Regions:
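Short, flexible, mixed-charge acidic loops at enzyme active sites
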Residues: 72-78, 201-209, 265
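A short small-residue
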Residues: 3-10, 209-219, 274
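Phosphate-binding site of ATP-dependent enzymes
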Residues: 150-231, 252-259
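ATP-binding N-terminal substructure of ATP-dependent carboxylate-amine bond-forming enzymes
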Residues: 1-96, 100, 107, 119-126, ...
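Active-site nucleotide/adenylate-binding loops and adjacent lid/helix of ATP-dependent enzymes
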Residues: 1-11, 39, 51-54, 94-178
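ATP-dependent carboxylate activation and anion-phosphoryl transfer catalytic cores
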Residues: 5, 109, 222-320
Length: 320
């Protein structure tokens, strides 16, 4: 859809996921340059960043964590009137807050886990939830601060560790089943990807340490179960008001019932990350995935222009 463009790729940033973001950014920059675009790297580690003149589109794909995923940078770019890839500021804000995401899922009838919110290390083990539990910061990504509570005596340590990363933590029942994730691209669910850690859960270590986790895409589910998983993922994506692309984490119970865990509006973009794996299973190379993210932003810009022109034409006819 696009010719050669001047693209600013934001990467790094001030969050706890800075190193992951830099790794994602290196891949995106390389891919876009290989496609002939002029690419400028911008690290918004301080709030006084300035966009280069003549920037045509800002690619936010690699900017993970607080500031990148919580709607802050999207809000700044919206105020500047600058075109950028991915979800808008409101959808980003909702998705980054795991509690808001669950509330939106519940309102939309999307299956999700039973949960409580805790803000103190002194909080006793919730009586309305059954062990094992998952404890995680309300506003973090990349499994930062994620803890598993298998026994009651693990509770206080898990809570204290998760509270290091946010003032509130989400406590939810650990779903027994198969762990999957579903990429969403231009309103279409990509092939389901199954995540199989060799030991423990899909925490920060297993996510970013080579050889700790196996991935299967497309996952081996029957057609009906696959459709249910993809439908739940799309439901969550629409519930938060998503656009362009995202990745939705879904647990699958033994009976095939999907349970949405969270929505990632800026998922990992290293060449071995999960969204690129799912795109590859759908026949898209890493470079094609990066290009489609740019094209989706340009498509939105063109649609907005056409709506504006149509509105002017309608007004002209009305006053003729």
């Amino acid at each position: 859809m696009s010719g050669r463009l001047k693209i600013v790729v934001m990467l790094g940033g001030p969050s706890a996921e800075r190193e992951v973001s830099l790794r994602s950014g290196a891949g995106v920059v390389k891919a876009l340059r290989s496609l002939g675009h002029t690419v400028v790297e911008l690290d918004p580690k301080t709030p006084d960043w300035i966009l280069p003149p003549d920037t045509e589109v800002v690619c936010l794909a690699p900017l993970h964590g607080t500031y990148g995923e919580d709607g802050t940078v999207q809000r700044q770019l919206e105020k500047l009137g600058v075109l950028f890839t991915g979800c808008d500021s409101e959808a980003s804000r909702i998705a980054f807050d795991k509690v808001l995401t669950k509330q939106k899922c519940i309102e939309s009838g999307v299956p999700t886990t039973k949960f409580v919110v805790v803000n103190s290390e002194k909080t006793p083990l919730p009586k309305n939830l059954q062990l094992p539990l998952v404890v995680k910061p309300v506003r973090q990504g990349s499994s930062v601060g994620l803890q598993f509570v298998e026994r009651a005596e693990d509770w206080q340590n898990a809570l204290a560790e998760a509270l290091k990363f946010d003032s509130e933590v989400l406590v939810e029942e650990k779903i027994v089943g198969r762990e999957t994730t579903v990429g969403i691209l231009d309103g279409v669910a990509l092939p389901v990807l199954e995540i199989c850690p060799k030991a423990g859960g899909f925490d920060y270590r297993n996510k970013y340490t080579a050889g700790c986790t196996e991935y299967f895409c497309p996952a081996e589910f029957d057609a009906a179960t696959t459709q249910r998983i993809q439908a739940a993922a799309l439901g969550a994506f629409h519930a938060i008001g998503g656009r362009d692309y995202a990745r939705v984490d879904v647990m699958v119970r033994a009976n095939g019932g999907p349970v949405v865990l969270e929505v990632n509006t800026l998922p990992g973009m290293t060449e071995t990350s999960l969204l690129p794996k799912a795109a590859a299973a759908a026949g898209l190379s890493y470079e094609e995935l990066c290009q489609q993210m740019i094209d989706l932003a340009l498509k939105r810009k063109q649609a907005a222009k056409e709506r504006k022109e149509h509105k002017k034409e309608t007004a002209s006819v009305a006053f003729a």
